[in-house]
């Protein structure tokens, strides 16, 4: 589906009817965000901001002392309570711990403190604008980005990871491997499910072998005809054969299957299908 210039895409065209039912059930109008979206969006940012910085320190990519001082120099007057808390704790561990232990302790405390601080800020913003949010008038801005100072602070926190981690060899190598695995799986699965005049239940055929690799849960969902409405029983479902799906639906099935894989499962399946390793190894 088109994203209308937004940062994230919405939903598949095939899910239009499901989304329409959701709008009707919740009473939302198109373009109006559900109140829970603001909280989920804030929770996602808060979690990853703190965790990514801590991981970067542990792997040796981020110098917590340098980045903290840079952050404090720019934002101390705006986020005073946060920096007072960190300063007091950092001073204590500088006196009690070795240099190597200090880094992990500071990173852990920084993560916990910044997450707690941002949770309170998001909660405060939500409660202060509760009526506006519930009426759908708050707009598409994130809870932690409505205030320009807080938006700048959030951007700088994300920038710590961006400057120090995203360009390092380990991250780039993982991205390249991920690209190879995902495109490799799609190159194998998509042509097989698009093959015409084949029996997907016949595992003697190549296409049948591929179809049986795809999780039965995804196949079950793909085979449901959500446009079918029974006159006798609204809960009645119409199940189709895999061969009866359109090309769009078949590709949709493969994309759902691949996107639902864990990293390790995707890697193992790719290696098995490419003949790099045997399934029972």
Where are these regions (language model features)?
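Polyanionic (Asp/Glu-rich) segments that form extended negatively charged tracts
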Residues: 78-140, 197-202, 209, 218, ...
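Substrate-recognition/cap regions that form aromatic- and gly/pro-loop-enriched pockets
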Residues: 127-231
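Sequence-structural signature of the catalytic-core scaffold of metal-dependent phosphohydrolases
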Residues: 1-108, 119
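Intrinsically disordered or highly flexible coil/loop and linker segments, enriched in small
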Residues: 28-34, 45-59, 124-136, 163-174, ...
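Glycine- and acidic
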Residues: 24-35, 99-105, 161-171, 247-255
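Secondary-structure capping and boundary motifs in well-ordered enzyme cores
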Residues: 31-39, 107-111, 115, 146-153, ...
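C-terminal amphipathic alpha-helical interaction region
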Residues: 203-272, 276
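Divalent metal-coordination and catalytic microenvironments
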Residues: 44, 182, 258
